[in-house]
Amino acid sequence: MKKQVRKKDEFQFNKERYYLMYKNIEKQTKLNLKDQVDYQPGQVVSKTLVQNEYVSMTIFSFDKGEEISTHAAGGDAMVTVLEGKGRFTVGGEVFFLEAGDTLIMPKDIPHAVYGEEQFKMQLVVSY
């Protein structure tokens, strides 16, 4: 089997694309993701940390009673609750998640998120 060799320029382009993908966050610093977004009365607040053609990572805060209405994503979505408690409806099934819990929401399946109380979550979508 013949080994595939990359051209130097192609490698440099890919290397830069992968290493320069974080934004809106301090690098080389110890931090806690839940501290990266604040609660706002009556709002859902988001802060995108990564966005490219392969993956997105966003931190959200939900005030109690706030929601993201039913929608579907173009990739598999993984949510991890960082603080508080939220309700997730995925394909008609309801899940209650609290700090430390993670849920995978499959691509193209309708889902919604509701703040049972104030809560924060990390969302990672892979395309």
Where are these predicted regions, by residue range?
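A cytosolic small-molecule/anion-sensing beta-strand core signal
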Residues: 82-83, 98-99, 117
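A short, compositionally biased micro-patch
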Residues: 50-52, 63, 73, 81, ...
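Conserved short histidine dyad/triad with adjacent acidic residue
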Residues: 42-43, 56-73
